[in-house]
């Protein structure tokens, strides 16, 4: 049966060939951040440097939020309409984000972000401002890069995804080492390595996919600039990207009101991070599902493949969560968590460990909704998810005192119900043949 699954039906080999590099590409930040932190930790004033870089990059990634969804739009539309129209829309969105970046960083609006939202002052504020000015163009490049990777995904050219991702990672590492040896300040080292490597990676993936970017049989018409249909498709996706970004701040706000908030907040953040690293394959499921649909593969094959990946991930998460020598090695030996933090982090991880099939279920049905090109249900799904989060957090203040339990349940319940709502809204939509 295993032989038949992998060798006879080449669909599964094709699917894995797209999934693995796409998942690594989308989760590469989880590998780059510790690397940069380790190098910045060897510079003068490492705490301020790492904090300055972290705040600055979080602001830039918030401005670049459309990059999380531009890949999905590209995959859905690239083979169905004039490619030039998709390219124009991506350039338009990236230019708008660049304008927002300049407006926020180079005008008095920066004071609102740095002083009122992030409460920075003194050297920390000055360093964050310098970081932002060094990397103001990062949102523009991020959106362009994700669009180019989407072209490689929808063209089923996994080798190009591997090449671009590995090249970008190596560039980041080498540039960070070079800037360290030159004597850059820590925060300048971090933001410069990310910005320059991003520019090089974007150029590299552009060169790799250049033959798939244009179709010379297509005519340059006025319709290329009429992108109202793409905005209509994209707006719900952007809304869906904003809602999850409020989940962690909302949970942290509640945890500060419960017992032992420092340990609880740390446990929830570490638990989520470890779960994300263990379940990294799921990061690429959405793009893989959309690519397979776009290339005409049968829905039932896509569904079987997606759930196969989810149950493999479920097995791995359960193995770590419930086999004591394994979780002790990871949480205590590798992450050096003390007894109290270890127990609370393990509790969070166990509460999340059952989620992989539901995470894939949500991505599958949202993929069906996207493939239909009518994305309004995605707004309703995320509103329902947000209501579940608010209701649970409101009740937990009065009913529960264990912060790790509240944080873990908040994440697991909202993601579980998001999958249920996705199924409810997507089950009656026509599946791709």
Regions found by a protein language model. Name each.
Residues 100-129, 316-346:
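Short membrane-interface helical motifs at transmembrane helix boundaries
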Residues 169-202, 386-420, 424, 428:
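Membrane-interface helix-loop junctions in multi-pass transport and translocation proteins
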Residues 1-18, 126, 191-194, 199, ...:
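Interhelical loop/hinge segments that connect adjacent transmembrane helices in multipass membrane
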Residues 97-211, 384:
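Hydrophobic transmembrane helix module of multi-pass membrane transport proteins
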Residues 52-101, 145-154, 268-320, 362-370, ...:
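Small-residue-rich hydrophobic transmembrane alpha-helices
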Residues 47, 81, 154-155, 183-184, ...:
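Helix-loop interface residues and adjacent transmembrane-helix termini in multi-pass membrane transporters
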Residues 20-72, 138, 235-291, 316-317, ...:
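Transmembrane helix-bundle signature of multi-pass secondary active exporters and lipid flippases
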Residues 122-148, 278, 339-365:
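Alpha-helical transmembrane segments of multi-pass membrane proteins
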């Amino acid at each position: 049966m295993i032989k038949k699954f992998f060798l006879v039906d080449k669909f599964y080999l094709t699917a894995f060939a797209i999934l693995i590099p796409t998942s690594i590409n989308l989760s590469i930040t989880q590998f780059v951040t510790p690397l940069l932190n380790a190098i910045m930790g060897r510079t003068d004033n490492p705490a301020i440097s790492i904090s300055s870089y972290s705040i600055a990059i979080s602001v830039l990634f918030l401005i670049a939020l459309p990059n999380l969804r531009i890949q999905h739009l590209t995959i859905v539309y690239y083979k169905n309409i004039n490619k030039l129209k998709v390219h124009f829309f991506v350039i338009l969105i990236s230019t708008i984000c660049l304008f927002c970046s300049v407006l926020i960083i180079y005008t008095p609006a920066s004071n609102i972000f740095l002083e009122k939202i992030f409460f920075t002052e003194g050297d920390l504020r000055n360093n964050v401002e310098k970081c932002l000015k060094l990397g103001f163009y990062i949102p523009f490049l991020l959106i362009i890069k994700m669009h180019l990777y989407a072209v490689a995904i929808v063209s089923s050219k996994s080798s190009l995804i591997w090449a671009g991702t590995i090249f970008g990672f190596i560039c980041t590492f080498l540039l960070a080492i070079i800037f360290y040896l030159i004597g850059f300040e820590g925060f300048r080292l971090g933001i410069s390595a990310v910005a320059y490597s991003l520019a090089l990676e974007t150029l590299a993936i552009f060169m790799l996919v250049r033959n798939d970017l244009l179709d010379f049989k297509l005519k340059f018409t006025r319709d290329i600039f009429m992108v109202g249909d793409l905005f209509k498709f994209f707006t719900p996706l952007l809304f869906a990207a904003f809602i999850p970004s409020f989940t962690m701040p909302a949970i942290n706000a509640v945890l500060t009101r419960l017992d032992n908030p420092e340990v609880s907040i740390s446990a929830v953040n570490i638990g989520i991070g470890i779960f994300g690293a263990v379940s990294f394959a799921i990061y690429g499921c959405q793009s893989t599902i959309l690519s397979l649909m776009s290339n005409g593969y049968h829905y039932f094959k896509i569904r079987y493949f997606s759930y196969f990946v989810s149950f493999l991930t479920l097995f791995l998460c359960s193995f770590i969560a419930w086999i004591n020598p394994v979780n002790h090695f990871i949480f205590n030996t590798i992450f050096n968590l003390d007894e109290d933090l270890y127990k609370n982090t393990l509790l969070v991880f166990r509460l999340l460990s059952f989620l992989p099939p539901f995470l894939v279920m949500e991505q599958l049905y949202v993929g069906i909704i996207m493939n239909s090109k009518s994305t309004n249900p995605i707004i309703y799904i995320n509103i329902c998810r947000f209501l579940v989060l608010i209701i649970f957090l409101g009740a937990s203040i009065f009913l529960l005192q264990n912060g790790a339990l509240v944080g873990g349940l908040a994440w697991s319940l909202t993601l579980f119900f998001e999958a249920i709502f996705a199924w409810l809204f997507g089950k009656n939509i026509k599946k791709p043949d």
